Structure formats: structure tokens, C-alpha cells
Amino acid sequence: LFFLINLGYFKNYPTKKKRKMKYLFVLLFAGISAGAQIQKEQLNLMPWPQNVVINEGNFTLTKNFKVNITGNPNPRIFGGVTRFLRRLDGRTGIFFEQGFIAKLNEVPNAELQINCTKSGKIGLYEDESYHLDITSNKITLNASSDLGALHGLETLLQMLQNSSTSFYFPASKISDFPRFTWRGLMIDASRHFQPVDVIKRNIDALAAMKMNVFHWHLVDDQGWRIEMKKYTKFIELASDGLYYTQEEIKNIVKYADERGILIVPEIDVPGHGSAILTAYPEIGSKVITLTGGTSEKNIQGTAIATYGIERNAGIFSPTLDPSNPKTYQILSGVFDEVCPLFPGAYFHIGGDENEGKDWDANPKIQEFKKKHNLKTNHELQTYFTMQLAPMLKKHGKQLMGWEEILTKDLSKEAIVHSWRGPNEGMAAGQSLVDAVKKGYKTVLSNGYYIDLMYPIASHYLNDPMPKGANLTAEEKARILGGEATMWTELVTSTTIDTRLWPRTAAIAERLWSAEDVVDVENMRKRLESVSFRLEELGLTHIRNKDVILRNIANNQDIKALEEFSNVSEPLKGYTRNKGGTEYQMYSPFTLFADACGPDAKDALGFNVAVNQYLANKSADNKAKVAAYFTKWIAVHQELTKLSANAPLVQPLLPLSKKLNDASQELLLVLENKSTLKASDLKGLIEQCNTKDHADVELSVYESLKKLI
């Protein structure tokens, strides 16, 4: 119509009437656009549900939107729905008339109807499925338990869309359930203590990503973090005053329960014992030979060694004495006090990285091994582990430990936590296969060590179900799921969120969604939206980057630092803290490497631009590549200026200079104007592969190589 009017087909119509026809056409087109159906691929759902069907129409939100709950849910559903409403009004700015939901069937004609048939029990094997049906005038959420309903509410929040003037949910049907029953995150609160608010906001994030286990690593060489009423030396001598009171722990457990999260505490024994033995050295294995004088004796007559809280990272000798009855007396008392704080069915006893050096050097322990026909330290550790099992069982707890606990004599009730891989000289996931074949339930963490700064794709494509392992259906059923692990040797409360999120959301999808949901680029697209939305839960993973950069810039303009961080990544694996001694637990973690993360944004974009240019050397594609080089040249200039009044910028200049030099020459290469020999050009690019500056590396190196 618009086309015909302009061609003169309606030339005999009055001008005013023709204007009206054009106006009606614009309105008609706008209406068609506003009503255009969203495509499934445009949704930013994570984890991706098992089944999604998009239908015609939308449910438009107004202030009259209300929620009603029916069935027999756990009371946690009321808090969950209230939080849902607050997050929804926070996103939309709509002043909903409904404030707090406190009882069943309060608003029978509400637009959102939630029905739960039973009260969900926190733990494994609960039905977490849900069914969400959105029409143009009603939303129905059905779930067997309130845990499933909470998951459904998270999906509903992610379904929220907007036009220029309103917010709506696309009409759809979603049926969903988790693939694995154990979908966890471990946070190490020993090496760097993590305050209560850090723990709570990350529990909120776990719930948002439909994860259901929080593994709380509370005791290691670097500190004891649980208030003890009986054995008070733990907090007096081994905590640096940084610990959770029992009331704080109870409060966090309640907080997690309200969000459907199981908490699994960990006290790491018999190795990683520096903090424990700082408090109670009499149960240590180390032998001290006295040259004179007298010394207090432990009950076996061995001089008591002096231990201290460990300030470095790594594997250390202090180990509990498995031959000493007092070891079990103290641990039994600890479990009697700690187990009631955690109502869940599982207790993690660590059991990893015990090299047995102090055991080998202690004659009494060697005598104990012979007496009990224990041929190896591994068998001795199994003996130790099996003494703990009844202590935990008394409190209704199942024992769980890192994969080193696995021996032929281990009780089949124990859960084996698989963690070692190529970094430890092992085949990835081999212990998981060994465990399930021997009849043990197991959880995978190898491949989910997010503290090691590996690319997100490496975690996302790491499936707990091993390929080609030839497992029976029964053996596969013993693979409970997986757990992301956040060790905190190089992580403080300021940086922990930036290391956890949004990458943990990709792991959450691997543990929840169907096995064939493996499109990395699609995941990245959705993750960008998910990351933004996680901020509403109080996570600091986006804003704290700028906090660190402002400190580095000495409160000057941080734009150049931001741009440089977009091509820089922290050194990966264990290379940032070689030998565990470059940093101590009290070192500053406010450096440039702490502001950087894996999957540097501009590195990803530059790689795409280079690939497009190499496939089609058009002027447009060449300009896109050149724009990056121009930017990096300017960044080096700005960093140089910035460093005049910002000493913390100085360590970056050698690296930014190398990128600057490569960029200048590659601009000439793009124009066929470079006069450098091929070997010299290659050497210039190789300079960008250095790992010698500021504990970061340039993540554009591989893409730069493609251009020569």
C-alpha cells in the first residue's frame, strides 16, 4: 500500500486521505512486528530445558498479575514465590498489587497458578521435574514437589521478553527435568575465608541455575573455619580469627534449604592437616628427635611436633596419626558437634593428597601397619577412613571423599569424588570409571576446576558420562553427576564471583540438560544474558572487575585497562603460582591478572574477524581486522600515559608493547606493505606468546599467527 501510494496509484485521492492511509500502514506494520512470534532459538534459557514448544500469542504483564499456590508443598515455596515476584517487578518496574505470598489458595483466580503435590525433601533422588504452560491469559506451573516448582519459576523468569512498551511471556509449553541428580559447586573457605554474604549470594546463583548441591570446604592446611564449643583450640589457634559461628552455619543451612540446596560440609583428613595439628599437635604423625631437655609426650611416647597454619599453596606433610587412639577421640568429638549443624545425608572427609611422608618416618606407625597387616599407606588410609564411617553413620551421614579413598576394603556406602586428570598425571575420569565398575556411586569434578582459568568450552563439553567406557546401565546409574570446584589459593571475596560466574552456569547446563545440548556458540549467546541477570542476585562478577581496574589506575580513566583486559587472560592451570610459593594467602590479589578472566571478549571477536577475512578477503572483512589493530595501538599509548601516575600499570607495558608492535606490522601486512622478512614477522608474533608479564597471557596469539 505504501509503495502504491508513492507510485501515484492513488493520485486522485485527497492529500490528507493519502497521509492517513500511510499512517494506517505504519500502524499495521508495527502491529505485525509487535505480534511477531519469538523463535525458540531466540530464548536465553539456561540450563536449556528438556522440551520447549513455542505457541501463538503472548502473556502480557500488568500490575494485576497475581500468583496462587495449591497442593501440598513445603513452606519454602512461599518465600520462593515472593522472591520471584520481587525479581520480576525489579526487572519490569511494574508495581504489582500482590506483595507477599504466605498461604495456600489465597488468590484462586490468579493468572499464575502453581500446583505442587508434595513437600520436597532436600537431597538426592527427589523429583525436580516441572511443567510450564503459558497462554495469552494464564500461566500454569505443575510440579511433583516444590523443588520442581522453584526450578519452573527460574525458567519463567528467563522467558521474560519485552517490546518497546511492555513485558510479556511468550505462549509456550515447557516440560523439564534434570539429567543428573548431583549438580554441585564446591567453595573452598579454608585457603581464603569467604564471608557469609559471599556464601549466600552464591547459593542464590546456584538456585537460579537449577543446581542443588553446595559443597563447603571448611578445613584445610590454611585454616579451620567452624566454631567449636568443645575443642576450642581449633578457632583459637588455627583460624586466624576467621571462622563461621555455629549460628551463622545454621542460618546458611536454612537459607540453602529455602532455595532447594543441599549443603555437604568437608573436613579434610588425614592429610592437609596443618591447621588441625596447629590446634592439636599431639595427634600428628611427625616425629621430633630431641637433642636434650624434656618435652611433653603424646600418649605413645613420641615428642610432639610444632605445627603452624600453612601460608602457601601445595601439598604438605602434616598428617593425622592413624595409629593414635586420641586422633579418633578428637575426630569423634568434632563430628558429634559438627554433624548436627548439617541435616543433609552426606559428609565429605577429603582424604586427598596424602603422600604419607610422616607416616613413613614414624617407627610407631610402621609398627602399627605390621600389627594390622597393612602393606601400604593406601591400606593404612583405608583403615583410617573406615574408623570414621561409624562416627558419621551415628549421625545418619554417608561418607564421601576424594578419589584417593577408593580401595578394595572401602565400604560400598561411600561416595567417591573423582578429581584427578592430566594435570596429576592421570587419565581424565579414570577413577570415576573404576569406582562405578567396583560398585561405588561417584561424582565428577575433573574438568570442572573453574579456578584453573580454562576456557568455558572445556568445561561445557566435559560430560560426566564417559565416552567409550562400556558401562552397564547399572554402572551408569552410579554416576550421580558433577561438581564445579572453586579452590581459593588465588581467590578472595573480592574476586571469587568473577572466577565462578558466569562459567558455572555452563557447567550447570551440562549437568541438567540433554546430552546433545552441546552447541558452544549458542551457549555463549545465552550466557551473556544469563550473566547480566545474575547481577540481580547480588553477584559481583561484572562490577568488581572495574573495582580492581580503578585501583590499578589509581582512580584515573580505566578505559585502556578495560580494553587490554579484553585480550588478556590469567595464566592457566597451576602456572600462575608455580610451586605454590609465588603467592601467600595474605598476598595482594588486586592485580591485573585478578581483573582478567578466561574467554577474553575481544580475543573471541578477533578470532571470528580473522576467520571471516581469511575466508573472504573483502574490504569490509579487512577493515574489521584492521580496527582491532588500530585499537590495540591506541591502548598501548594510553597505558603508557596512564602509567605515569599509576605504578601498577607499569608491569603491563612490556606486554602491551609487544601487541602494539605486532599490530603495527600486521596493518602493513593487510595492505601488502610489510618489508619484514617472513622469519622476522614470525618472531614479532611469537613475542605475543610470552607468559612473563603480570601473570597474564595475550589470548589473541593463535589468531595473530593465522595472518602470517
Model-predicted regions and their roles:
Residues 98-100, 265, 401:
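A structural preference for short, hydrophobic beta-strand core positions in alpha/beta folds
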Residues 102-108, 222-231, 406-412:
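Beta-rich nucleic-acid/ligand-interaction surfaces
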Residues 45-48, 53-55, 260, 318, ...:
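Substrate-binding groove of N-acetylhexosamine-processing glycoside hydrolases
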Residues 37-180, 513-514, 518-520, 525-537:
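Contiguous, structured surface segment used for ligand recognition
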Residues 75-77, 193-195, 221-225, 270-276, ...:
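Flexible loop/turn segments at secondary-structure boundaries
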Residues 350-374:
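N-terminal leader/propeptide and maturation segments of large enzyme subunits in energy/redox metabolism
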Residues 1-41:
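Bacterial Sec-dependent N-terminal signal peptides
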Residues 119-346, 362, 387, 391, ...:
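Feature activates predominantly on carbohydrate-active enzymes
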